[in-house]
């Protein structure tokens, strides 16, 4: 288990608890009362820390190396019904953007999302979750296929941004993202977006338009990362905490500004502390969202979605 800097008090108490339990197992000393006392302190400390997280600490949690990624959610939710589909039919198959068909109960869904790696090798293979233009074009191809067959779409967002390399720009990174945003606003099937980690810039927006946009409790969604914002405004990454506060990037901030529709509660300590619980919660959220939109006609669906986005950012005096 890896710990973030603000989780050090929890780490210390967990080590104390582990040592006390080991002493009890290896000797005849009764440490039951001590273990219970430490366990009580541990619960109180966890509540104290996680109920008062700063925006920057939530950013840190969203990047936790043990946090579940897109394929973890899809495999847990769909089981062996998931069939991955590949390629944009033009350039190549972008490994940073995955997608395919799967079932939740008896209902088929088209799943799309950015995928990160678990170690150095797989992180390079997945390009750290930063998709190229062909990744966004693959995502659009899958969404258009879903529209053709009347299958609802689920997008899992978890990216530090679209890949900013020269080759990506040469192949039309900006156009690919813009095209996705345009097409998603008028797609004639329900679209549900779940932000499961980082939601950075146009890289997130490229698969982020939906009838219902949900954010996990410890995720963020912003035009720029706190570090990049800090380096632009203050010429240093040292002010990233201040930048995170100013950007209003947390799920609570997004809900308050009506830029998302729902906050999905995470287990205490983050999604990685109880994977089964967060998988079941996300599955229920998707199923509930589908129940809400499944009876709308195609015209009503598109009109409602367009109306939602046209209302964003409108000043009312």
Swiss-Prot record:
Transferase recorded as keyword: yes
GO biological process, one term: fatty acid biosynthetic process
Subcellular location: Cytoplasm
Reactions this protein catalyses: N(6)-carboxybiotinyl-L-lysyl-[protein] + acetyl-CoA = N(6)-biotinyl-L-lysyl-[protein] + malonyl-CoA
GO cellular component annotations of the record: acetyl-CoA carboxylase complex
Coiled coil, from the record: none
GO MF, one example: ATP binding
Domain CoA carboxyltransferase C-terminal residue range list: 37-292
Keywords: ATP-binding, Cytoplasm, Fatty acid biosynthesis, Fatty acid metabolism, Lipid biosynthesis, Lipid metabolism, Nucleotide-binding, Transferase
Keyword Lipid metabolism: yes
Pathway in which the depicted protein is active: Lipid metabolism; malonyl-CoA biosynthesis; malonyl-CoA from acetyl-CoA: step 1/1
Listed InterPro entries: Acetyl_CoA_COase_a_su (IPR001095), ClpP/crotonase-like_dom_sf (IPR029045), COA_CT_C (IPR011763)
Enzyme Commission code: 2.1.3.15
One Pfam family this sequence matches: ACCA
Role noted for this protein: Component of the acetyl coenzyme A carboxylase (ACC) complex. First, biotin carboxylase catalyzes the carboxylation of biotin on its carrier protein (BCCP) and then the CO(2) group is transferred by the carboxyltransferase to acetyl-CoA to form malonyl-CoA.
Record family assignment: Belongs to the AccA family.
Quaternary data: Acetyl-CoA carboxylase is a heterohexamer composed of biotin carboxyl carrier protein (AccB), biotin carboxylase (AccC) and two subunits each of ACCase subunit alpha (AccA) and ACCase subunit beta (AccD).
PANTHER family hit by this protein: ACETYL-COENZYME A CARBOXYLASE CARBOXYL TRANSFERASE SUBUNIT ALPHA (PTHR42853), ACETYL-COENZYME A CARBOXYLASE CARBOXYL TRANSFERASE SUBUNIT ALPHA, CHLOROPLASTIC (PTHR42853:SF3)
UniProt protein name: Acetyl-coenzyme A carboxylase carboxyl transferase subunit alpha
Lineage of producing organism: Bacteria, Pseudomonadati, Bacteroidota, Flavobacteriia, Flavobacteriales
């Amino acid at each position: 288990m890896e710990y973030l800097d603000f989780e050090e008090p929890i780490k210390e108490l967990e080590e104390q608890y582990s040592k006390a339990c080991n002493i009890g197992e290896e000797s005849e000393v009764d440490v039951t009362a001590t273990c219970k006392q430490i366990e009580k302190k541990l619960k109180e400390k966890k509540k104290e820390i996680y109920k008062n997280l700063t925006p920057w600490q939530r950013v840190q949690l969203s990047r936790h190396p043990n946090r579940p990624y897109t394929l973890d959610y899809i495999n847990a939710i769909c089981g062996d019904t998931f069939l991955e589909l590949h390629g944009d039919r033009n350039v190549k198959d972008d490994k940073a953007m995955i997608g395919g068909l799967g079932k939740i109960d008896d209902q088929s869904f088209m799943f799309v999302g950015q995928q990160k790696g678990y170690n150095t090798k797989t992180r390079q293979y997945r390009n750290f979750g930063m998709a190229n233009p062909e990744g966004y074009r693959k995502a659009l191809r899958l969404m258009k296929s879903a529209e053709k067959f009347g299958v609802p779409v689920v997008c899992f967002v978890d990216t530090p941004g679209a890949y900013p390399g020269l080759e990506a720009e040469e192949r039309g990174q900006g156009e690919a993202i813009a095209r996705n945003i345009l097409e998603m606003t008028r797609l004639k099937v329900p679209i549900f977006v779940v932000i499961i980690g980082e939601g950075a810039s146009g890289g997130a927006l490229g698969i982020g338009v939906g009838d219902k946009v949900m954010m996990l409790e410890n995720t963020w969604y912003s035009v720029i990362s706190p570090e990049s914002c800090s380096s632009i405004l203050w010429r240093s990454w040292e002010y990233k905490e201040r930048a995170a506060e100013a950007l209003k990037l947390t799920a609570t901030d997004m809900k308050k500004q009506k830029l998302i529709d729902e906050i999905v509660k995470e287990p205490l300590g983050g999604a990685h502390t109880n994977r089964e619980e967060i998988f079941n919660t996300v599955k229920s959220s998707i199923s509930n969202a589908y129940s809400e939109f499944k009876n709308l006609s195609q015209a009503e669906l598109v009109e409602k979605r367009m109306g939602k986005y046209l209302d964003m950012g409108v000043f009312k005096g």
